[in-house]
Regions:
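Sec-dependent N-terminal signal peptides of Gram-positive bacterial secreted proteins and lipoproteins
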Residues: 12-16
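Short amphipathic alpha-helical heptad-repeat segments
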Residues: 33-36, 58-62, 81-88
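Bacterial N-terminal signal peptides that target proteins for export
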Residues: 1-10
């Protein structure tokens, strides 16, 4: 009987300790995927800034990425970082919109804003005791 109690107690502690990791980890994986892909597309778009069709495709992907992030489930352990994820993705979306409309200067400014907001996002995630994984 005592052994069963110890096993149940150990299981409870394990669940308690790692439940945040499971929820935070899933969110962080999704956030990292969204941020990394947005950053990659932004860098590729900067090289191909004159290609309107490429910019249109990147803009469409950026809109979808922002929409997906807007409806993600956010664990309370990481909730303070989520608005910054949205700002990162919004700046990438606006940058790709500028590229699609041939506004090179606006594109570069918004790309820089997205990069700066990503830095802030990563700092906040670290302050909360987490880290965006490398995906």
């Amino acid at each position: 009987m005592r052994r069963m109690s110890l096993i149940a107690y150990a299981s409870f502690l394990f669940t308690l300790c790692f439940s945040g990791l499971a929820f935070g980890g899933s969110y962080l994986d999704r956030a990292a995927l969204l941020v990394n892909e947005a950053g990659h597309e932004g860098n590729v778009l900067r090289i191909r800034l004159g290609d309107k069709e490429f910019a249109r495709v990147v803009h469409s992907l950026s809109q979808s990425r922002l929409e997906a992030a807007s409806h993600m489930q956010v664990p309370k352990e990481i909730a303070l970082a989520h608005p910054h994820l949205l700002m990162v993705l919004e700046n990438y979306e606006r940058a790709s919109d500028a590229a699609e409309h041939g506004e090179a200067q606006r594109f570069l400014v918004l790309l820089q804003k997205a990069t700066e907001e990503e830095r802030i996002l990563r700092l906040i995630v670290e302050q909360l005791g987490w880290q965006l994984p490398k995906i």
